[in-house]
């Protein structure tokens, strides 16, 4: 990326500083998903043949498995580490496996090239890193909303089940830190269900705002593409 602008190698400290891969490797699932969609788009435009599309999609599937492969290796060598330790080990292993990767986009390009050769470079046709990161971030937020929403729904269902089991049990309500009139325990629990429903509606609205694709917008002027806005 830098070689086209500078005649001398970058200072080592600056080179490490400008790399975002140690952080944005977490966007691997989203980068792969966006790359698959783009592969279908350029195949529809005649840039990839059907065989090339199949090879590209299969290669991307293998790249997407990298973190799982590292997780299996870590478990095999050190037993079953706790969640935080395991994530740190996976992160260190992934970053160390691609010291030359500038960012998640470059990482996928390098790993896909290992899998399918020069064909991987065709995937760069008609897209820029600007739109790639914009797409990845929207997918990441959307996936996070889905995960959070599922958790909230499960929590609400648990509260409803618990409320149904309390029967006519009562408890004191509180106002200004002082006990007030008695209320049903079920009603107190269901009040939290109402709060969860409010949060779910907000997440639903946020997801709708996230759910469009900025692909084909390029660095500044848009370029025509069947995927734009979908």
Language model segments and positions:
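A helix-coil-helix interface module used to build multimeric assemblies
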Residues: 1-75, 82-222, 226-229
């Amino acid at each position: 990326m830098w070689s086209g602008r500078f005649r001398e190698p970058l200072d080592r400290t600056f080179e490490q500083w400008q790399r975002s891969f140690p952080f944005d490797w977490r966007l691997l699932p989203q980068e792969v998903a966006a790359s698959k969609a783009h592969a279908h788009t350029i195949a529809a435009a005649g840039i990839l043949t059907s065989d090339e599309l199949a090879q590209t999609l299969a290669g991307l599937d293998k790249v997407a498995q990298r973190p799982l492969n590292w997780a299996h290796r870590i478990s095999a060598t050190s037993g079953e580490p706790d969640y935080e330790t395991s994530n740190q080990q996976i992160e260190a292993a992934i970053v160390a496996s691609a010291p030359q990767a500038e960012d998640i986009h470059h990482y996928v390009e390098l790993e896909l090239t290992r899998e399918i050769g020069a064909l991987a470079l065709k995937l760069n046709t008609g897209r820029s890193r600007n739109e790639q990161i914009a797409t990845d971030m929207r997918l990441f937020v959307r996936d996070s909303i889905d995960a959070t929403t599922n958790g909230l729904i499960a929590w609400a269902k648990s509260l409803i089940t618990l409320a149904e089991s309390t029967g006519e049990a009562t408890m004191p309500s509180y106002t200004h830190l002082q006990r007030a009139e008695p209320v049903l325990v079920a009603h107190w629990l269901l009040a939290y269900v109402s709060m969860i429903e409010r949060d779910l509606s907000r997440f639903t609205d946020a997801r709708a705002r996230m759910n469009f694709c900025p692909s084909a917008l390029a660095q500044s002027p848009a370029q025509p593409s069947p995927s734009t806005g979908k």
